[in-house]
């Protein structure tokens, strides 16, 4: 395309990161806000102009002129590791400073996933994020289905394909909740 940020190598590299603890501790803006001066852009789950549903952020390089492909990859990898370190520190802070609030949040998410009858896509992404945080912090028991698989398979297109008919409104939200209830009945130890 004719976008000025594509001048140079034209290499666009991005990574998706799940940052629920940074969001819960109100540190996400501070951490991600420091990326623009480094030539990195932060977007939501669906790219430019989108929100970060499910606490998932896309981080990508903006500058391709005057940087080698190797430098671009090395820079993004180093920054990603720092962001992950910040997320892990925030999780530790939640464990030590707000254990009951954290436990309540993740257990409420699990209860909703196991029992809800209607779930919007936005609510699903939010509670799946909380549930994953609970599993990774070893507060909640693991489930057999993976986080990304659950996110993708709870989207409208996948639900319509599985049900072999168009879905919208409450019927779509019902089928999404039904799918997730079934997935959460399959627990792994």
Annotate each language-model stretch with its function.
Residues 1-17:
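Conserved phosphate/anionic-ligand binding catalytic regions in large, soluble enzymes, centered on
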Residues 11, 23-25, 30-189:
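Long, Pro/Ser/Thr-rich low-complexity/intrinsically disordered regulatory tracts in eukaryotic proteins
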């Amino acid at each position: 395309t004719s976008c000025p940020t594509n001048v140079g190598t034209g290499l666009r590299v991005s990574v998706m990161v799940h940052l629920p603890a940074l969001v819960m501790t109100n540190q996400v803006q501070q951490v991600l806000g420091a990326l623009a001066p480094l030539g990195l852009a932060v977007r939501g789950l669906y790219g430019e102009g989108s929100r970060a549903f499910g606490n998932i952020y896309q981080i990508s390089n903006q500058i391709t002129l005057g940087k080698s492909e190797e430098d671009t990859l090395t820079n993004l990898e180093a920054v990603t590791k720092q962001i992950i370190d910040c997320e892990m520190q925030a999780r530790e802070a939640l464990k030590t400073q707000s254990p009951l609030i954290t436990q309540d949040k993740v257990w409420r998410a699990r209860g909703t996933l196991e029992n809800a009858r209607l779930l919007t896509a936005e609510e699903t992404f939010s509670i799946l994020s909380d549930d994953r945080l609970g599993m990774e912090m070893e507060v909640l028991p693991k489930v057999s289905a993976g986080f990304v698989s659950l996110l993708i398979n709870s989207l409208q297109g996948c639900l319509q394909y599985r049900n072999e008919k168009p879905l919208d409104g409450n019927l779509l939200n019902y089928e999404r909740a039904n799918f997730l209830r079934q997935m959460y009945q399959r627990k792994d130890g």
